[in-house]
């Protein structure tokens, strides 16, 4: 095994122009890994804590590096991540920051893969690696916390579930993204882009469904395979403690369940993320009972990549899939533990980016390593296509 020789940190910019943490890990036999932490806009209240970048880097240098340098082996991911927890000594990384922790964890994994002369997904995969590749979920139109004066629903997603290859799925999503813009232009609707590169027109949700469904149908006809729709409702952002407020519509929990169930039926949705409040396991269970045989009901803010919350959901029958974001929980080991728990209990695990991203491609490798059915990482934009292009390369070399 290869011992960690040096750990270095620096501030860099993410896709929103905000500072984030980049970590570099070097081993005593020349292995090298570099990784950067992403950052979310609509964050769950139960996520691990992200510290201001300067504080996180200082904590990394003072508390993390001394625990790793000369003491831990890069190839022992569980040992590295245990040392990160020991350096923090809280349950949510509030002492050192989940941003510096996850950057370090991912950089160590890359350094270990470098020493072994294998890809990161091969190093991480082990027994979890199957023969499939994840289908990209691409955000093509939206609003919510990602864009002002746009749709109330945060993300309108597309997934080329019928594509014969990762490459074709990626290209199909990009084509839908362009067709959405063409349709908006035809209707005289201007649209800038939101945080994740999706179009953010000032239209209501009903109009958005028409635009995206029409664009997806055109691309499906052109490419010759199914392109299905999905949603991230980010409902916790719309819940006022009594009702769900989406634009001019106010709905009780029962009405929200009916609304989402109706959307699943009307649009044949492949995926529905955070349709209800992040603390309402009972409502999630009711919706899952209604539509779980037809679509993935995915918990993001509900589970925050946390095994304790996931186990609570499993016990309640809440959702049937989990969104996995390593920075929500702080380490790759914790993320993989959540994936393993989900898989053992019949839940799918969908690996995801954040709205504030970098060119780091670790999540592409994590999705392949763990045989994820979907990877949610946008449709266009340099920090999004970095992951998508990496998926294409991995598929070509596999």
From Swiss-Prot:
Mg(2+) binds at residues 232, 273, 300. Its main location: cytoplasm. This is Enolase. Pathway: Carbohydrate degradation; glycolysis; pyruvate from D-glyceraldehyde 3-phosphate: step 4/5. It is found in: Cytoplasm; Secreted; Cell surface. The gene is eno. SMART domains: Enolase_C, Enolase_N. Its cofactor is Mg(2+).
């Amino acid at each position: 095994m290869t011992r960690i020789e040096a750990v270095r940190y620096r501030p860099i910019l993410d896709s929103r122009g905000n500072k984030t943490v980049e970590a570099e890990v070097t081993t005593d036999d020349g292995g090298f890994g570099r990784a950067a932490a992403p950052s979310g806009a609509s964050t769950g209240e139960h996520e691990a804590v992200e510290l201001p970048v300067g504080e996180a880097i200082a904590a990394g240098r003072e508390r993390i590096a001394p625990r790793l340098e000369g003491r831990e082996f890069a190839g022992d991911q569980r040992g590295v991540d245990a040392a990160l927890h020991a350096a923090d000594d809280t349950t949510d990384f509030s002492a050192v920051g989940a941003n510096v922790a996850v950057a370090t964890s991912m950089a160590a994994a890359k350094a270990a893969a470098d020493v072994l002369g294998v890809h990161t997904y091969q190093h991480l995969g082990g027994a979890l690696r199957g023969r499939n590749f994840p289908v990209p979920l691409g955000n093509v139109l939206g609003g919510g916390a990602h864009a002002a004066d746009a749709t109330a629903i945060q993300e309108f997603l597309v997934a080329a579930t019928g594509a014969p290859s990762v490459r074709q799925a990626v290209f199909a999503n990009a084509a839908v993204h362009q067709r959405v813009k063409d349709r908006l232009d035809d209707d005289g609707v201007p649209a800038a882009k939101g945080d994740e590169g999706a179009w953010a027109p000032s239209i209501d949700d009903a109009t958005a469904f028409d635009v995206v469904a029409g664009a997806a149908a055109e691309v499906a006809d052109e490419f010759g395979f199914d392109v299905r729709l999905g949603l991230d409702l980010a409902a916790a952002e719309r819940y006022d403690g009594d009702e769900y407020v989406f634009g001019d519509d106010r709905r009780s929990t029962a009405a929200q369940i009916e609304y989402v169930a109706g959307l699943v039926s009307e649009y044949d949705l492949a995926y529905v993320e955070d349709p209800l409040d992040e603390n309402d396991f009972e409502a999630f269970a009711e919706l899952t009972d209604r539509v779980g045989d037809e679509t993935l009901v995915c918990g993001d803010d509900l589970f925050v990549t946390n095994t304790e919350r996931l186990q609570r959901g499993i016990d309640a029958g809440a959702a049937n899939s989990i969104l996995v974001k390593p920075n929500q929980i702080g380490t790759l080991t914790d993320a993989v533990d959540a994936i393993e728990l989900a898989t053992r209990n019949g839940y799918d695990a969908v690996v995801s980016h954040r709205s504030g991203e970098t060119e780091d491609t670790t999540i592409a490798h994590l999705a392949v390593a763990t045989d994820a059915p979907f990877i949610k990482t946008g449709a266009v934009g340099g920090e999004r296509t970095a992951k998508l292009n990496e998926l294409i390369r991995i598929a070509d070399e596999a």
